[in-house]
């Protein structure tokens, strides 16, 4: 669950720090209130395309950072596979974009490539907007949800280890 979103130097946003309460969150507002800008920053954080044109002040980089409450999620395997420090309660994801468009991504302060970032964050956030396709229709997401609800993280980690051993044999 997204518990905090920090945005700095993105489009019209100089700095914004939002704390979310537990439960369902809806972002609403009048036309021009900035909903799409916040959604754009969140999309960037989740592995979306970095665009140097979104840099508000070219002397500073864009920083979008989110804190997630991951208690109860089956994510330990991702952290282990990517050699990232694991905290079963909380995870911090950060994306930075320079004025030249160069982008860096981090999970718990460990650098990750954008592909791994996308894979990881699809397990944390599902954005639904008008006319959008739902991630719920993808088999991988359905399996991840079932495994998470069944608390299969240890079984999945053991399977992954056995599979890697078989591939390396």
Predicted stretch roles:
Residues 4-166:
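Gly/Lys-enriched N-terminal cap/neck module of very large, oligomeric protein machines
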């Amino acid at each position: 669950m997204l518990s905090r979103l920090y945005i700095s130097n993105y489009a019209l946003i100089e700095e914004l720090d939002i704390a979310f309460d537990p439960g369902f969150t809806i972002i609403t507002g009048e036309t021009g209130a900035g909903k799409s800008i916040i959604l754009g920053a969140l999309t960037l954080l989740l592995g979306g395309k970095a665009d140097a044109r979104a840099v508000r002040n070219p002397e500073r980089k864009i920083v979008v950072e989110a804190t997630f409450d991951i208690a109860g999620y089956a994510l330990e395997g991702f952290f282990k596979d990517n050699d990232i420090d694991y905290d079963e309660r909380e995870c911090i994801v950060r994306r930075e974009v320079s004025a030249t468009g160069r982008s860096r991504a981090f999970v718990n302060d460990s650098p990750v490539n954008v592909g791994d970032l996308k894979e990881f964050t699809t397990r944390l956030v599902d954005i639904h907007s008008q006319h959008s396709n739902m991630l719920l229709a993808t088999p991988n997401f359905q399996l991840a949800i079932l495994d998470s609800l069944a608390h299969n993280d240890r079984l999945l980690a053991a399977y992954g280890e056995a599979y890697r051993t078989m591939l390396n044999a």
